[in-house]
C-alpha cells in the first residue's frame, strides 16, 4: 500500500523543517512525499530544498502562487500516485517514526476506506508541552450529525474515494476540511476505521486554532451544516465546540 503524504506551505520558515523531517524519518518504505509551497516570501523554499536533499527519489516539490492552503492540498492530491492520502501540515509533525507503518497495518487489517486516529496539540514554542489531547473514539455516523468530526490531520483516506467523493471546496478559507469530512463520513457511507494511537502533534496557533480566525470559522461551519440540512444548525455548531471540552481536561493528566 503506497501512502502519499502532502504538506502545504506558505511562509513557514520557523516550522517547516520539523514537519518535513518528521515525514522523511518514517520507517514505512512506500511513501510518496509531496510538498506544495505557495511561492513563500521568507526562507521556506531554501529550507525545504536543504531538508529534502538526498531524498529526491521520494519527494515531489513545487513552489508556485496559489489561492490558499486548500488549493495547495488539492494540487498535491492530483499529483499523488499513492493508494492512500494523508496530510502533514507545515506547523505540525508526525508523532513517531513508525506512525505510517501502524496506520497501514490497521488499514490492511480492516480494509477500510477512511482511517482516523488520535492527536495532540502542543504549545507553539514548547512542543513538549501538551495543551490538548484529542481522542477520536469509536466512529458512529450519528455523531457527525451532532457536530463530532475526527481530527483532520489524523485522517488517512483512499485516493480513489477522494476522487469519487470530491476534493476540498476552495471557496472555504478555513472550514473546507469540515465540509469534506462531513461529506465523506455522513453522505458517502464509507468503511471507516479508528486507530486508538497518537499519529500527529499539532502546534496551537494554526489556522483553525487561531482566535482571530474563530468568527470566520463559525460562519463557515454554519454554512457547511446548513448545506447538509442539519437543523437546528446553530445547535450542531455548539455541539461541535462541546466535543472539544474533554480534550483540555485530559491534557492536564498527560
Can you name each region flagged by the protein language model?
Residues 210-235:
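Catalytic core of nucleotide-sugar-dependent glycosyltransferases
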Residues 1-213, 253:
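Nucleotide-sugar donor-binding/catalytic module of glycosyltransferases
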Residues 226-254:
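Membrane-proximal basic amphipathic "stem/tether" segments
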